[in-house]
Amino acid sequence: MTGSTIAPTTDYRNTTATGLTSALNLPQVHAFVNDWASLDMWWFSIALMFVCLIIMWLICCLKRRRARPPIYRPIIVLNPHNEKIHRLDGLKPCSLLLQYD
């Protein structure tokens, strides 16, 4: 053993420039972070954000539409001859339970 020193395997100059502070040397992560800016991939992040916003907006609209009661106004015609309520909306007629004085 002659006084040799072991050099560190991590080059901190490469990792601190990208914000990575790991003690391990990960060349694939380093290349990905640097290539993200060099490949002009900034538009992908913005597009992904807009896609998520549109999906969230559609979910909110569908939940509100499902929560509202349906607007339903039946058309009812009273027919005094057979004491039944005739509905013009296609549903079954129901018997009239009112007593006449």
Curated annotation (Swiss-Prot):
Q: How is it modified after translation?
A: Glycosylated by host. Palmitoylated at cytoplasmic tail.
Residue spans, topological domain Cytoplasmic: 63-101
Instruction: State where the protein is found.
Output: Host nucleus membrane; Host endoplasmic reticulum membrane; Host Golgi apparatus membrane
The glycosylation sites annotated in the UniProt record are N14
List, alphabetically, the Pfam families matched: Hum_adeno_E3A
Record's keyword terms, sorted: Early protein, Glycoprotein, Host endoplasmic reticulum, Host Golgi apparatus, Host membrane, Host nucleus, Lipoprotein, Membrane, Palmitate, Transmembrane, Transmembrane helix
- Sum up the protein's function in the record's words: Promotes the release of progeny virus from the host cell nucleus by accelerating the lysis and death of the host cell.
Q: Which GO terms describe its cellular component?
A: host cell endoplasmic reticulum membrane; host cell Golgi membrane; host cell nuclear membrane; membrane
- Which protein family is it in? Belongs to the adenoviridae ADP family.
Q: Which residues lie on this side of the membrane: Extracellular?
A: 1-40
Q: What quaternary arrangement does the UniProt entry report?
A: May interact with host MAD2L2/MAD2B.
Among the GO biological process terms of this entry, one is: viral release from host cell by cytolysis
Q: Quick check: keyword ATP-binding in the entry?
A: no
Q: What is its main location?
A: host cell
Q: Provide the topology term for how it sits in the membrane.
A: Single-pass type I membrane protein
Residues crossing the lipid bilayer are 41-62
* The protein, known as: Adenovirus death protein
Natural source organism: Human adenovirus C serotype 2
